[in-house]
Swiss-Prot record:
Protein name: (Z)-beta-ocimene synthase TPS13PK, chloroplastic
Role description: Involved in monoterpene (C10) olefins biosynthesis, constituants of cannabinoids and terpenoids-rich resins. Catalyzes mainly the conversion of (2E)-geranyl diphosphate to (Z)-beta-ocimene.
Residues that hold (2E)-geranyl diphosphate according to the record: R334, D371, D375, R515, D518
Taxonomic path: Eukaryota, Viridiplantae, Streptophyta, Embryophyta, Tracheophyta
Species the sequence originates in: Cannabis sativa (Hemp)
Pfam entry (one): Terpene_synth
Listed EC numbers: 4.2.3.228
Length: 640
C-alpha cells in the first residue's frame, strides 16, 4: 500500500512548465498496481481479441441508435416560472444590512481582543454558516495577523487549536507548515491526543485533508488513527441512544459533537459543496448551547434572500432552454436544466455571480445534450461530421449534418458568438471566442475518441483512458468559460496565452476529480446501456482485480488528486519571509486570480456532491431532489 501511495500521484502529475500531453502520457506509465507490467502482454492480446470479435458488429452498431431511456425532467417550466419568494421585500434586505453591521462590529472586536483561538472559531462559524463572504476583508486581516505572529502556534498541547489554525490558514492559501503541531507531539513524534478529546480529534481529522503532494509529516498517518477513534465514538453514542430507546426513554441530550463527527466521516469538510454545507450547518448550529442569535438570524435571512436570487436565475435559464427547442426536438437527450443550474450554485453561490450562474447553466445544458449525442444517439459517421463542424466553427458546416445535429450545433454556435460583450469586450473578445471554440472542439474530439473505442469494441489501458477522460468529462470547457467571466480578459491573459498549448494544472486536477467521481457514480448504468469502459473497468481489466478493489484504488487516486489541487493554491515553497505585507500566493499572482482558483476547487466539491450516492445528474435520485428543494425551493423558517 505504501508503494501504491508513492506512485499513484504520478498518474495525475503534469509538468506546469510544459503542457505537452506527451509528458502526461509518459507520466502515467507508473500505474496503480504492481501487476501492470506483468499483465501487459496479456492486456494487449485481450484487446486485439476483443477488437477482432467485435469488428463484425461494427456496421450494425454504426447504423443503430441506442436509447438510455432517461426519465423526463422532474422540474417543469410552468412550475419554475411560478416560484416566488417573500424575501425579495426591501424590509428583509434592510434587516440583513443592519445585522451585517452588528456582525462586522463583532469581528472587529474579536480582532482587537487579541484572542487568536476565539478569532479562528468565529471565522469557522462564519464560513460554515455561509456568511463569511460579507466579511472577507476583516477575515483576511485576522488570518494575516495570526500567520505573521504565530499566535496559536505557541499554544502548548492543544490539538484542537493548532488543527483549526492549520486548516483555516491553508484554506486561505497561507503556507503554514506541519511544524505547527510540534507542541502536540511526544518525544517519538506521535500526536498526544486524548481519545476523550473528540473536539481535538475531529479538528485534526479535518485538517489532514489540506496536505499537498509529496508533503512529509505525520498528519496523514494520524488521519487513519483519528478516523478509527471517531468511528468508535459514533458507535458508542448510537449504542447509548439505542439503550435509552429500549427503556422507552427519549430524553437523551442533543449531542452537537456527534452531529459534526458523523457528518465529517461521511465526507470531509474540505470536499463538501459550500452552500449545501451551510444549509446543513444552520440547522445544527441552531441547537448549539452557545449559539449566537445574531449570527444565526443573519445566516437564515441571507440564505433566503440569496435563494430568491437563484429563483430569478432559474426562470431565466428555463426560458432560454425553452427557446432553443432542444428539449422538444432532441427527446433522446437528458433535459436536466434544474440540475445543470444546481452545479453552478455549487461552483459560485454568492449573489454577485448571478450572470455567471446563468451562463454556465447554459454551458452545462449544451454539454449534457452533446454528451448524449455522442454516448447514446449518434452513429459514428454522424459523430465524425459533428466533430468536424465544431472544429471548423463555420455556419456552413451545418449543411452536412442531420437535422437533430443542426439544432444542437446552431444552439452552441449562437451561444458562443453571442456571449455578453460586457464580458468579452475590447480586442480580446475575438481571441477569447476562438479559445472557447477550441475548448468545445477539444471536448468533441475526446467524445469522438471514446465513440470509436465503443464501436471498435476496444478497451483502453488505464493510462490511455485517463489521458482522454479528464477532457471528455467537460471540466476544461466549464472552467475555460468561467475564467473569462471572473477576470478581466484584457489584463489577465494567463489562460489565453496558453490556450493552444494546454490548460493550467488546476483545470486538469479539478477535471480529474470530476472524471473519477463521475465514473464512481455512473459507470454501472452507462455500461448497461452500452458505453466505453470507464476508469473502474479499465483497472479491473488491466490488473485482474475485483470491482471493489478497483473502486478502492480510484478512491485513493481521488485523494491524491486533492493533494495536487491543494498544491495549486498553497505554495509551501514560498520564500516570502512574512511581515505585515505578506499575502497568500493567489492574492499576489498576476496570472490566475483567487475567485477562479476557488471555483476550480468548488467544481471538484460539486462532483462529490452529485455523485456521492450514484448518478445524481442523469438519474435524478432522491438526494439530488432533496438538494434542489433545500437550496433552491424551500426557504429556511425564521424563528418568531
Amino acid at each position: 500500500m505504501a508503494a501504491l501511495v508513492s506512485t499513484v500521484s504520478s498518474i495525475i502529475r503534469w509538468n506546469s512548465n510544459n503542457n505537452n500531453n506527451n509528458n502526461f502520457t509518459r507520466s502515467v506509465k507508473s500505474c496503480l498496481s504492481s501487476n501492470y507490467h506483468n499483465n501487459n502482454n496479456i492486456i494487449h492480446n485481450k484487446t486485439v481479441l476483443m477488437s477482432t470479435n467485435n469488428n463484425n458488429n461494427n456496421n450494425q452498431k454504426n447504423s443503430s441508435r441506442r436509447s438510455a431511456n432517461y426519465q423526463p425532467p422532474l422540474w417543469q417550466f410552468d412550475y419554475v416560472q411560478s416560484l416566488s419568494s417573500p424575501f425579495k421585500d426591501e424590509a428583509y434586505v434592510k434587516r440583513v444590512e443592519k445585522l451585517k453591521e452588528e456582525v462586522r462590529v463583532m469581528v472587529k472586536r474579536a480582532r482587537e481582543e487579541e484572542k487568536p483561538l476565539s478569532q479562528l472559531e468565529l471565522i469557522d462559524v462564519l464560513q460554515r454558516l455561509g456568511i463569511s463572504y460579507h466579511f472577507e476583508d476583516e477575515i483576511n486581516d485576522i488570518l494575516k495577523h495570526i500567520y505573521n505572529n504565530n499566535n496559536v502556534y505557541n499554544t502548548n498541547n492543544n490539538v484542537y487549536a493548532n488543527s483549526l489554525e492549520f486548516r483555516l490558514l491553508r484554506q486561505h492559501g497561507y503556507p503554514v507548515s506541519q511544524e505547527i503541531f510540534s507542541t502536540c507531539k511526544d518525544e517519538r513524534g506521535n500526536f498526544m491526543v486524548c481519545t476523550n478529546d473528540i473536539k481535538g480529534m475531529l479538528s485534526l481529522y479535518e485538517a489532514s485533508f489540506y496536505l499537498v503532494e509529496n508533503e512529509d509529516g505525520i498528519l496523514e498517518e494520524t488521519r487513519e488513527k483519528t478516523k478509527k477513534y471517531l468511528e468508535e465514538y459514533i458507535i458508542m453514542i448510537m449504542e447509548k441512544q439505542q439503550s435509552l430507546l429500549d427503556q422507552n426513554n427519549n430524553n437523551y441530550d442533543y449531542d452537537y459533537d456527534y452531529e459534526l463527527v458523523s457528518h465529517a466521516l461521511e465526507l470531509p469538510l474540505h470536499w463538501r459543496m459550500l452552500r449545501l454545507e451551510s444549509r446543513w450547518f444552520i440547522d445544527v448550529y441552531e441547537k448549539r448551547l452557545d449559539m449566537n442569535p445574531t449570527l444565526l438570524t443573519l445566516a437564515k435571512l441571507d440564505f433566503n434572500i440569496v435563494q430568491s436570487i437563484y429563483q430569478d436565475d432559474l426562470k431565466h435559464v428555463f426560458s432560454w432552454w425553452e427557446s432553443t427547442d432542444m428539449g422538444k426536438k432532441l427527446e433522446f437527450a437528458r433535459d436536466r436544466t434544474m440540475v445543470n443550474f444546481l452545479w453552478t450554485v455549487g461552483v459560485a453561490f454568492e449573489p454577485h455571480f448571478k450572470s455567471f450562474r446563468r451562463m454556465i447553466t447554459k454551458v452545462n445544458a449544451l454539454i449534457t445534450v452533446i454528451d448524449d449525442i455522442y454516448d447514446v444517439y449518434g452513429t459514428l459517421d454522424e459523430l465524425e461530421l459533428f466533430t468536424n463542424a465544431v472544429e471548423r466553427w463555420d455556419i456552413s458546416a451545418m449543411d452536412g449534418l442531420p437535422e437533430y445535429m443542426k439544432t444542437c450545433f446552431l444552439a452552441l454556435y449562437n451561444f458562443i458568438n453571442d456571449l455578453p460583450f460586457d464580458v468579452l469586450k475590447g480586442e480580446e473578445g475575438l481571441h477569447i471566442i476562438k479559445f472557447l471554440q477550441k475548448s468545445w472542439a477539444d471536448l468533441c474530439k475526446s467524445y469522438l475518441r471514446e465513440a470509436r473505442w465503443y464501436y471498435n469494441g476496444y478497451t483502453p489501458s488505464f493510462e490511455e483512458y485517463i489521458e482522454n477522460a479528464w477532457i471528455s468529462i467537460s471540466g476544461p470547457v466549464i472552467l475555460s468559460h468561467l475564467y473569462f467571466f471572473v477576470v478581466n480578459p484584457n489584463k489577465e491573459n494567463a489562460l489565453l496565452s496558453t490556450c493552444f498549448d494546454g490548460y493550467p494544472t488546476i483545470i486538469r486536477h479539478s477535471s480529474m476529480i470530476l472524471r473519477l467521481k463521475d465514473d464512481m457514480g455512473t459507470s454501472t448504468d452507462e455500461l448497461k446501456r452500452g458505453d466505453v469502459p470507464k476508469s473502474i473497468q479499465c483497472k479491473m481489466y488491466e490488473d485482474g482485480i475485483s470491482e471493489e478493489e478497483a473502486r478502492q484504488r480510484i478512491k485513493l487516486l481521488i485523494s491524491e488528486t486533492w493533494k495536487l489541487i491543494n498544491k495549486d493554491y498553497i505554495n509551501l515553497d514560498d520564500d516570502d519571509d512574512g511581515g505585515d505585507d505578506y499575502s497568500p500566493m493567489f492574492y499576489k499572482s498576476n496570472n490566475i486570480n483567487k475567485a477562479f482558483i476557488e471555483m476550480c476547487l468548488n467544481l471538484g466539491r460539486m462532483a462529490h456532491c452529485i455523485y456521492q450516492y450514484g448518478d445524481g445528474h442523469g438519474i435524478q435520485d432522491r438526494q439530488t431532489k432533496d438538494h434542489v428543494l433545500s437550496l433552491l425551493i424551500h426557504p429556511i423558517p425564521l424563528t418568531q
